[in-house]
Amino acid sequence: MTKESKPDRLRQMGALNPKPESVRAPWFREAGFFDPLDLVQVKYEMLRHAREDGTNKADAAALFGLSRQTYYQAEAAFERDGMSGLLPRTRGPKSAHKLTGEVMRLVEEHLDANGQLQARSLADLVHSRLGISVHPRSIERAVARKKKR
């Protein structure tokens, strides 16, 4: 069995820095403990550099190859959750989890009868008949995916 490399593990976690070459902090350039590929470590060091070394936030963000917005997001996450706030989080569902087979059958029946896609009225129909609140845009995307197949 082959051992996974650190970049592979970071990629799986969502913590691989997409622009490690942008990290200009000298202690990241020297081989050793600091790894510009590790986005969690880069964010932590950026915050530490601004707080402990007195660098302003914009300069700290630039030194670590990140935006000011990323600095403020990391700062808020760190204040709220500590070190675990810097870890990547999985975002919402990646699929249309509300568009079950039952919902899609109702949508398709309505489309077959009317032949015209009116997503808002379909969303209202799904809500009134099945009690499921679906965004009209989700219905439009599902119908478009179905047409592609």
Swiss-Prot record:
Residues 1-20 are annotated as: Disordered. This is Uncharacterized protein y4oM. It comes from the Bacteria. Residues 1-11 have a biased composition (Basic and acidic residues). It comes from Sinorhizobium fredii (strain NBRC 101917 / NGR234). InterPro entries: Homeodomain-like_sf, InsJ-like_HTH. Keywords: Plasmid.
